[in-house]
C-alpha cells in the first residue's frame, strides 16, 4: 500500500489556506492541487505530491516528493509580490512549524514523520510575462 499523495496534497492545500485566512502574504493567491489542475487562474500556487518509494519502502516507510509551484503573471502580480509569496510558503513550511505541518498532513492511515526543504528552481517567460518558482520538499510517510 502506497501513501495517498492526493490526501497529502489536499491537507497541505488546506494548511496553506489557513494562513491566507490569518492575513499572511498568501492572501489573494489561488491555491490548487496538482500542476495540471483544470481551472487554474493566471497566478496560483500548485501542490503536487509524488510517491518516490525509497529504500525504506519494504518497512512501510515511503519517501514522497512534494513540489509547490508558485506562478505569477507580471501584469497581475508584481515580481516583489511573487517573491513575497515564495518566501511566505518557505516560512510556513519551515522547521519551526513542523509540528503544525505534520498535524495537517497526518491521518488515520498514514503519518508524515518529516518534511525537508530541498531547494528551488526559478524560471521566467518574457513572452507571456510569467514568473515561476518550484519549491521542492521531501517527506517521509509511515503506514500506521
Where are these regions (language model features)?
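N-terminal, polar/charged subdomain of small-to-medium soluble alpha/beta proteins
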Residues: 35, 43-45, 62
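Short, solvent-exposed polar/charged micro-motifs at secondary-structure junctions
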Residues: 39-44, 125
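Short acidic low-complexity segments
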Residues: 30-40
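Charged, amphipathic alpha-helical segments and their flanking helix caps
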Residues: 1-29, 48-144
Amino acid at each position: 500500500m502506497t501513501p495517498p499523495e492526493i490526501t497529502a496534497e489536499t491537507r497541505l492545500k488546506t494548511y496553506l489556506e489557513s494562513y491566507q485566512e490569518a492575513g499572511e502574504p498568501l492572501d489573494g493567491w489561488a491555491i490548487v492541487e496538482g500542476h495540471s489542475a483544470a481551472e487554474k487562474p493566471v497566478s496560483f500556487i500548485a501542490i503536487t505530491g509524488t510517491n518516490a518509494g525509497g529504500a525504506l519502502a519494504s518497512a512501510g516507510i515511503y519517501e514522497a516528493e512534494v513540489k509547490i509551484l508558485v506562478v505569477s503573471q507580471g501584469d497581475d502580480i508584481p515580481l516583489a509580490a511573487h517573491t513575497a509569496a515564495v518566501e511566505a510558503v518557505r516560512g510556513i513550511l519551515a522547521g519551526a512549524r513542523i509540528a503544525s505541518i505534520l498535524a495537517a498532513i497526518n491521518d488515520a492511515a498514514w503519518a508524515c514523520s518529516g518534511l525537508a526543504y530541498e531547494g528551488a528552481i526559478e524560471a521566467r517567460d518574457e513572452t507571456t510575462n510569467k514568473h515561476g518558482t518550484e519549491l521542492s520538499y521531501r517527506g517521509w510517510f509511515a503506514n500506521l
